[in-house]
């Protein structure tokens, strides 16, 4: 069979997702010619890869004018309307779906052998007060008898470049089916939804509102928008997909994390590291940066580093000459190679790492750690925190690098939440809101390309204590800020500082650089009832009033508030009591 595929691609960030490449690879054998029509700009490397891998035969780049229908029209023009009759079928498809979840070959054979079918698709939409019955346009296939008809040519040559997507829906998507039905042609779909039960659905759009039905009827494609629209059940859909299909779920996770925020709950459920081992000799360049403020903890880390089964360079920073000498003595006694750099007592562990920009930029992977203690809280805060971070990010370093190497889209690995922050109610939305302005400032300073207002987020997925593994490119924009001691408050460090902002920004910086993240699971398993008890408090249902004394008088304003606030409260109480009398 001579089949033509006209495949439309669009990505608002002007890159091509892995799920598109996978899709083309899997469906390519079905078609004798594939025309790839991109409504967004492609790099030369991407175009070369598409051609060299024989994923497509032709590449057509165009402005995103007229959306998919105008793109398909232009694809037909590129092939030649008079040449379409040389094909047994023409299939129209776009990249708005993940798949194929199952092999398409049997579906093609079924419809090609069905004499009662002139054109077909995956799913349809029943007639309602707004639209006529129609095949949903993410997948349409026309047989030769339709291709050679005047109806086909008149419809597609008449497609206009609408700038409003609703005009495209009203004039083309919902009418392409009725146009051919009125001409006497017949259609079928893989999943005929016309008489299906729609209980609980906002609209009878099964491709969007009912992913369970899509899987049950073995539709080989699931729409991207369906994933985001059904967050509450998506973890179960993912489980079912793993059970019934061989489709790589990482393709869904990576794409959804790139086109929207990477920290939605349904995505977090799938971001734990996989059980993966380093294969053979690991050839990438690895740097380990350890900031040593407490020299008495150095050997604890050196012992932990013995778990590494890869070659690495150790960079140690500290604040004063005396400590530098003590560190070098310990290293000498242990015959441990390392470069020790004195960076001063500003910026805690973060600025010392950033000051090594020139050195660390030469490495593929960087692990960042520090001798964590907590002077502001109980001994066990810092003690438990440090030990658990070592268990999550130092001990399993082989597994971490194996995961990051296996998935090129993963650029950073953080630790799971340390138990101290589950037993103790510290990181809560009202406190986090106070840090978001500083995060927004840094985001703007870095020239981030993705739009996000951190004030709109309740909490953040962060690397507690800034322990982290990363690909240098993932955090390059942070290093390129070239922060200095002048940017960092002096000790004692105030709350909501630039360092607290950086701690919370790391995975989002990587996201802006088109990298996803993974989480190393805490081996200390706690019942989620602890979180339920700590976080679900009735007081949180009441509005909170915050007073920022930095904006209303500083210390004098705070003292005035102590006097005036209670006085006004007492006055209010007396007034209410008098009214009751």
At which residue positions do the language-model features occur?
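ER/Golgi luminal nucleotide-sugar-dependent glycosyltransferases, focusing on the catalytic module
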Residues: 1-581
